[in-house]
Amino acid sequence: MTAMTNIYETTIIGGGPAGLYAAFQAGLYGLNGQLLEGDQQFGGKVATYAERVIHDIGGMPNITGQDLIQNLTAQAAFYDTPLRTQTLVTDVKYLADQDYYQIDTPDDRYYSQTLILAMGGGVVRPKQLRLFEEQTFENVHYAPANPEDYRDQRVVLIGPGYNLMELAPHLLATAKSVVWLTTKRPFVDEAAEKAFLTAYPQIDYYCQPLASYQQVDQQVTSITLADQTQITFDQAVVSLGYRRSLQTLDQWQLSAEQIEERPDIWVIGNQIPDRAGISLLTSAFQDGITAVTEIVAQLKPTAKTPMVTTHNPVFQADTKAYWQERLR
């Protein structure tokens, strides 16, 4: 791609809830935009608690993180806005003589008139299990998935993470067996631990160090505990917490002062500093709307405001499909 072939009107960097909803709004307002996400999946921080239920989104009493991500991704894709995963932005610089931004990734270079930064706390990476010495195994997963994915499998959960406390009971309905291994008690006290294990006696629970593991090809087949108990399994889910890093942003030629002062850069979502402890998804959605409407006012001052979605003919086919499904 070169500057002569395509200059995006806006580029959204970050594919969490804030970035995904901003991408939808960009399409709704007719902007030629794109979204760049460094991870292999969308969702940002929400992807780290995909199976937990969110209760504080207006009009949505309960929804899992996974379903929310799927819905936001489908919504963002409605206008065919390019949504790129595994596209880590390694550098951004302002080209003053041409009045737009050059955006570099490992595989390509893009150009954009405006930027929407929706990077939250940065790229989210799960902490690796030290026992495996940072090796990658086909049957070791660091992001809890749908319990259905483990049907009829012997599953071992590793770590003290609250994600596992949420996942373990659901696995009882699908997995062949569930074993939970941790070196640190995940419960607030002994009473809470006893209550959980009494409620779910089918879960085999061990709180002790992990001594070694056995593997066949690219799969771990068993783990030996400190007391020499051997746990054999088909699938492992590890939850030791996450590391978040904005290191790539620090390496950009675009300075912190430019990000703060330039009128064609918007920061949205959890990347906004000094939010007085407020961390609501709905705030991130409003940030995206504000950024997009201000970009339109700047680039297309005579553009008409799009019709509300309830009456917008663009959504006619989607609305028809919704009612057909609802009335089945």
Curated annotation (Swiss-Prot):
Its cofactor is FAD. It holds the Pfam family Pyr_redox_2. InterPro entries: FAD/NAD-bd_sf (IPR036188), FAD/NAD-binding_dom (IPR023753), Fd--NADP_Rdtase_type_2 (IPR022890), Ferredoxin-NADP_redctase_2 (IPR050097). The keyword rRNA-binding does not apply. Coiled coil: none annotated. FAD binds at residues 37, 45, 49, 89, 310. Binds 1 FAD per subunit. GO terms for molecular function: ferredoxin-NADP+ reductase activity; flavin adenine dinucleotide binding; NADP binding. Its EC number is 1.18.1.2. Keywords: FAD, Flavoprotein, NADP, Oxidoreductase. It catalyses: 2 reduced [2Fe-2S]-[ferredoxin] + NADP(+) + H(+) = 2 oxidized [2Fe-2S]-[ferredoxin] + NADPH. It comes from the Bacteria. Belongs to the ferredoxin--NADP reductase type 2 family. Homodimer. This is Ferredoxin--NADP reductase 1.
